[in-house]
Amino acid sequence: MLCPVIQKVIFSKQAFVERRLPVAGHGKFFVKKGTKVRPFDFVAEVPEAPRNPGSQRLTAGVGGEVVEVLSGRAILIKTSAVSVRGVIGKGEDEEGEIRIAADYNAPIELSAVDAGCASNVLVGGFVPTLEVFKKAEAVGVRGIVCGGTDFAAFQKSNLPTLLIEGFGRPPLNRKVFEFLKKVEGRHAFLSPGHEELLVARLDGAVEDVQEVGEVFAKLEEGMEVQVFSASCFGQMGKAGKVQGDMVEVSLNGDKISVPGRNLGIIK
């Protein structure tokens, strides 16, 4: 049986990052098309505005080459980056430094969210309550990346959020967590609408990730899989016996039968 391959963490030799002014028409870019930039190079001056108290300078956030300049609005930078893929996202695009707020299988607690998290993208196992989302938004957190959260809390929250596994309280994929832990403090771009977190690569940095490879692979017993059936959407488990079109999957100690078309192989 062939199943789609799900690569959660992928290195891309060519990625594009848009750096926008907080308010269109309010600011001036220093760079032009063809300019080479580094992550902490200033690329624009941003004057004081209602959403931007005090004059500031906008950094590139990534290293690469400016390939497009939209005067008074944005620039497009060609770079190399690592993409972390989720299954469900909500909210506007945001950016910030990665901050580990909880272990891969632990909840992001209210006590872990404080003023020091401002301008960060928080990472943890799962978000247990709506109050955590509300406090994170109140202190200036830019977004959350986690394994899952309750559907009701997800729907009521306004904070940009990327669920790597799905609804409920599944732990964050271990490979994803280990990668994000390794690059904690790195600037990242959260795009919930595209179900993706883009992590800038630093010059000379070597990440233990793979480039996009096979799209389908033969499902074998013992493989790590992700379930996309309604009752267990997004949960991870181990493939067991394959009988016709059905696959036995072990989930948290329980065994369920899932149609092969509703499984993805994790690599």
Segments (PLM) and residue ranges:
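Well-ordered secondary-structure scaffolds
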Residues: 1-267
